[in-house]
Amino acid sequence: MSVTPEVKSRGMKFAEEQLLKHGWTQGKGLGRRENGITQALKVTLKQDNHGVGHDPAKEFTDHWWSDLFNKTAASLVVDSGKDGVQIRRLSKETTQRSHPKPSLLYQKFVKTATLTSGEEKPDRDLGNCSDVDNHEPTPPKILTDEMLLKACEGRTAHKAARIGITMKAKLARLEAQEQAFLAQLKGSKALGTSQPLTDSEPSQKKKKKRKQKEGEEAATTEKSLGDELLGHTDRSFRDSRKKKKRQKAERQGTAIGSEEEEAAGESGPRELSTEQSDQPSRKKKKRRKQRHEEDGEMGVCDEGGRDVTSRPKAVNSGGDKDPRRSSKKRGTCGEDLDTQEEEGKDDLTKGERKVRRKDKRKRQQCCEEDLDVSSKDDGGTWVAEDAGERSRQYPKERAKKKKRKRDRGSEVDLS
């Protein structure tokens, strides 16, 4: 018959490996004398509701009927006499075990002697003892520290003291603290009545001083907070003003740059026909005015208030208006602007002066445009001269414009 090998679990294999490391071999028992178990304990799962020690096969192995028959047969006694055979049944009392009463001698054990090396040594004289002494419990004997130290031969629970490390300094310090505390308690009891009367006045003074200090601290903190808030608001106001000035200067600078570019682009030769009527010229003026208002594109003016953009020489076909009159008006407009600027120069900063200059240029340009529109609306039309003269003047005017631009840039940098 082939024996199937026992399949070992993972835990069993691990346990065998650990035992083999320590010199155990298969078949040996556990323990120093190797008389322990040789088979490992196997864990079984309990899947029933029976108690511990219950044998589920007892109903098959327990022959209760044979035991009962044997008991009844043992209780029957067969007597053979003159009268014949008689069967007598034993009483139940004979089957029970008898429990005799214990003797009074051993009910209460009294120690009378101690055995010492085979000899008896009586503890006390039995003749002098009485029943009262025997029944009274003796009080336990309380040993003092010295007696305990002597009985333990100098050994204590403090193991470090055996090698000379004691706590004498600490114990002395604790004792001194206790004595100081006791002395303080005695002094406080002696001065118990007089102390409250004397301490009441200093305590009130201390309270007043404490309140004054708290009030002063609160005042100083409020003052410091107010100063900080004022400084912060002043700083924020200054920063906002500077920011606004910077933004305004940037906007005006971009507007002037766009105006100069537009003026340079529009400075080309313009030919005006003499055959145009008054109505189309007015329409063109209106369109130009609308374009200037929408785009913010204005012509660049010089210091005297004159237009820098290249304009062809023209003659007035209608003799009602004189071109000199318009130039005079431009001059007066520029002078008014100069006087306004000089009046406000004293109380202005550098940034505000720049802004004023740019505003002045814009006002000059607006004045010139209004004058041009009014002179043309009265019936006079500008007629261009021959193309050759215009072409000769164009490069010169262009060079003048560039020069003026450079001069303005240098003025702005210096200011």
Curated annotation (Swiss-Prot):
Q: Is the keyword Acetylation in the record?
A: yes
Q: Which SMART domains match?
A: G_patch
Report domain G-patch positions: 11-57
Q: Which positions bear Phosphothreonine?
A: 4, 116
Could you name the Gene Ontology cellular component terms for this entry?
nucleolus; nucleoplasm
Keywords, alphabetical:
Acetylation, Isopeptide bond, Phosphoprotein, Ubl conjugation
Which residue windows does the record flag with biased composition (Polar residues)?
191-201
The molecular function terms of the Gene Ontology recorded here are:
nucleic acid binding
Q: Where is the composition biased (Acidic residues)?
A: 335-345
The cysteines joined by S-S bonds are none
PANTHER family attached to this UniProt entry? G PATCH DOMAIN CONTAINING PROTEIN, G PATCH DOMAIN-CONTAINING PROTEIN 4
Record-given protein name: G patch domain-containing protein 4
Gene name linked to the record:
Gpatch4
